[in-house]
Amino acid sequence: TARRNIEGEITIEEVQHLVKTYYQRKTAREEDDDKKEEADRVSANIAQLLGEDSFVYSVVGITSIHRRIFEGVFKHAGEIRNFDISKKEWVLRGDSVLYGNAPDLRRALVYDLEQEREFSYIGIPIDKTIKHIAKCISGLWQIHPFAEGNTRTTAVFTIKYLRSLGFQVNNDLFSQKSWYFRNALVRANYHNY
């Protein structure tokens, strides 16, 4: 299905329909079918999002990205979580990053997005530009505004933001090195004082 879409034989909407009907009609179930279905649906949704030129740099924009990636996958797609979380990370030997607390998530997103919006890249060398963007994206990820799907949402948001700044970026590196991307975000936000 993916190959047929890449070669232009079918649209992304047709891919989404084929994925949905495949899992609805499948009679023999395997233990990991739920994970496979999530991955297939999310991949098709991400491809659709990245195929669009639109981008809104705001809290509404990032929550919309989450909703569109996970619609039909998570009941809470596009909703900012209302509970606190911690996650034992193997890369931190079971320790957790300190994520944003539930009552402050929206304000934290607004603050981080505004700080970035006010930053001027004029005259900044490319190495410092990249370092600044990495810090910005890392900070957004640390807020972890959603119950699930924060890393994938951050990746799509990052691609669309970089494109809005004039960078030519696609999803290949993020999809091929997703585990590295997540672990880099974890390490960038870990403090063990």
Locate the predicted segments by residue.
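FIC/Doc superfamily catalytic core
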Residues: 1-193
